[in-house]
């Protein structure tokens, strides 16, 4: 949420740096919050109500013993923003996957990101151990089936796109084709430019035939507070079980979309935070607001790290043998699966979603990409035996990778540093606490 995150991070910085918390300062903070929310297209009435609550609480409530006034003011801002985005109503919501075969139906208008969301949701559930399949049910958009097939190949799940002109039949036959090999079948339905009667009839008939356990509306965050109207209309038409909001990373109106949907009572279950198939998060207002304010979300950071460690089984194997550049390459591959560095830094307290994250992550992302390009220019023998890399080989690798000899030497220095860490762990000089790969990652990020 470009702009919005920066604004909120600045508010946090202002509160933390304040020496006196008096009525004038509280009103100044309230005005800053108002400005941030209005620029994010949050409904004016909601903004005014939230402003009054923040001001009233900040001036009337006494902080608990030992808690500085500035910390308590930040807590009030945090709690009220969480409430604005759904509060406890959307806390810890899971999708219903209690049956042997669970059907998830994605609905929405054209251009909202349904097909991409289908693949992202497949990847998300796949990582949780489910066998997922995708079904195309859009006979109107010529490239829809091919797009879904390509995405299914990317996330490595089966896909079925029936060659008929009827959307309902495509859904029915697709679910039937995949039900024996999948725990979860995600149906990517057709959209329209608006919620017309024919779309409503089509979705209702489809729902009657395939009996979905979840009906998720996919909404683009760029529509802002209009998202609430869309959610209400679709809910009336097909009884939604939840909402997925896409493009939240780039939408200036993301705050408006989130708050408008939360106001309808339709649970926001997932948010899309980037273009990669890994960029889908279960929506939790508390951790989401914590990251926007720059106070971190350690639980999410740990979850992502653990997920990567579980996925990369070779990490433990590294400790049993010689650590080579090939091992380093595989660990950088594993690191890239955690998502872009700026996403990871958002979970770290004090980083937030502002400019500081983008500055640091840009340097780190460039370094990791450069390292991979350099190693792609090495032979298998060089990756397995880095000690043979003499001056002439380094020069050849630099030319082949379009980098400098200095860049290649920098990579080799990082490799030797990591190798020393691995050897210390192998010898027992460093205990295996916190994960050896985590230490490698920290060394890479430290640069």
Curated annotation (Swiss-Prot):
One Pfam family this sequence matches: SRP_SPB
Taxonomic lineage from the root: Archaea, Methanobacteriati, Methanobacteriota, Methanomada group, Methanopyri
Matching Gene3D superfamilies: P-loop containing nucleotide triphosphate hydrolases, Signal recognition particle SRP54, nucleotide-binding domain, Signal recognition particle, SRP54 subunit, M-domain
Binding site for GTP: 108-115, 188-192, 246-249
GO terms of molecular function: 7S RNA binding; ATP hydrolysis activity; GTP binding; GTPase activity
Alphabetized PROSITE patterns for the sequence: SRP54 (PS00300)
SMART domains: AAA, SRP54, SRP54_N
Superkingdom per UniProt: Archaea
InterPro entries: AAA+_ATPase, P-loop_NTPase, Signal_recog_part_SRP54_M_sf, Signal_recog_particl_SRP54_hlx, Signal_recog_particle_SRP54_M, SRP/SRP_N, SRP54, SRP54_GTPase_dom
EC annotation from Swiss-Prot or TrEMBL: 3.6.5.4
Comment field on protein domains: Composed of three domains: the N-terminal N domain, which is responsible for interactions with the ribosome, the central G domain, which binds GTP, and the C-terminal M domain, which binds the RNA and the signal sequence of the RNC.
Compartments, as annotated in UniProt: Cytoplasm
GO cellular component terms, semicolon-separated: signal recognition particle
Family: Belongs to the GTP-binding SRP family. SRP54 subfamily.
Protein keywords: Cytoplasm, GTP-binding, Hydrolase, Nucleotide-binding, Ribonucleoprotein, RNA-binding, Signal recognition particle
Biological role stated in the UniProt entry: Involved in targeting and insertion of nascent membrane proteins into the cytoplasmic membrane. Binds to the hydrophobic signal sequence of the ribosome-nascent chain (RNC) as it emerges from the ribosomes. The SRP-RNC complex is then targeted to the cytoplasmic membrane where it interacts with the SRP receptor FtsY.
Protein name: Signal recognition particle 54 kDa protein
One of the protein's GO biological processes: SRP-dependent cotranslational protein targeting to membrane
Quaternary structure (record): Part of the signal recognition particle protein translocation system, which is composed of SRP and FtsY. Archaeal SRP consists of a 7S RNA molecule of 300 nucleotides and two protein subunits: SRP54 and SRP19.
Gene that this sequence comes from: srp54
Catalytic activity: GTP + H2O = GDP + phosphate + H(+)
């Amino acid at each position: 949420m470009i702009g919005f995150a920066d604004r909120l991070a600045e508010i946090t910085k202002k509160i933390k740096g304040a020496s006196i918390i008096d009525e004038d300062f509280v009103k100044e903070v309230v005005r800053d919050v108002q400005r941030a929310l209005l620029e994010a297209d949050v409904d004016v009435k909601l903004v005014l109500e939230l402003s009054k609550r923040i001001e009233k609480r900040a001036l009337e409530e006494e902080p608990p013993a030992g808690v500085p006034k500035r910390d308590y003011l930040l807590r009030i801002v945090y709690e009220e923003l969480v409430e604005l985005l759904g509060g406890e109503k959307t806390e810890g919501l899971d999708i219903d996957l209690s049956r042997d075969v669970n059907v998830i139906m994605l609905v929405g208008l054209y251009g909202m990101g349904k097909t991409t969301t289908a693949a992202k949701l497949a990847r998300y559930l796949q990582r949780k151990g489910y066998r997922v399949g995708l079904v195309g049910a859009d006979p109107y958009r010529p490239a829809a089936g091919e797009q879904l097939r390509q995405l299914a190949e990317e996330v490595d799940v089966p896909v079925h796109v029936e060659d008929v002109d009827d959307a309902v039949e495509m859904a029915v036959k697709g679910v039937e084709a995949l039900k024996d090999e999948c725990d979860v079948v995600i149906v990517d339905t057709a959209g329209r430019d608006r919620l017309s009667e024919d779309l409503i009839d089509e979705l209702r008939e489809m729902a009657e035939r395939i009996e979905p356990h979840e009906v998720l509306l996919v909404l683009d965050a760029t529509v802002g507070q209009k998202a609430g109207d869309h959610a209400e209309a679709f809910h009336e038409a097909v009884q939604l079980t939840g909402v997925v909001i896409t493009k939240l990373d780039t939408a200036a109106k993301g705050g408006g979309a989130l708050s408008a949907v939360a106001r309808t009572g339709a649970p926001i279950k997932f948010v899309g935070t980037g273009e990669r198939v890994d960029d889908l998060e279960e929506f939790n207002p508390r951790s989401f607001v914590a990251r926007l304010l720059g106070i971190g979300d350690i639980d999410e950071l740990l979850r992502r790290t653990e997920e990567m460690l579980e996925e990369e089984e070779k990490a433990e194997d590294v400790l049993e043998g010689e650590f080579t550049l090939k091992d380093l390459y595989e660990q950088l591959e594993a690191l890239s699966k955690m998502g872009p560095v700026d996403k990871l830094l958002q979970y770290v307290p004090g980083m937030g979603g502002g400019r500081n994250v983008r500055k640091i992550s840009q340097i780190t992302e460039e370094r990791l990409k450069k390292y991979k390009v350099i190693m792609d220019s090495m032979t298998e023998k060089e990756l397995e035996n880095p000690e043979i890399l003499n001056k002439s080989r380094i020069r050849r690798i630099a030319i082949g990778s379009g980098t400098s000899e200095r860049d290649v030497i920098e990579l080799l220095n990082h490799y030797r540093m990591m190798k020393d860490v691995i050897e210390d762990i192998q010898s027992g000089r460093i205990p295996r606490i916190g994960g050896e790969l985590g230490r490698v990652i920290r060394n890479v990020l430290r640069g």
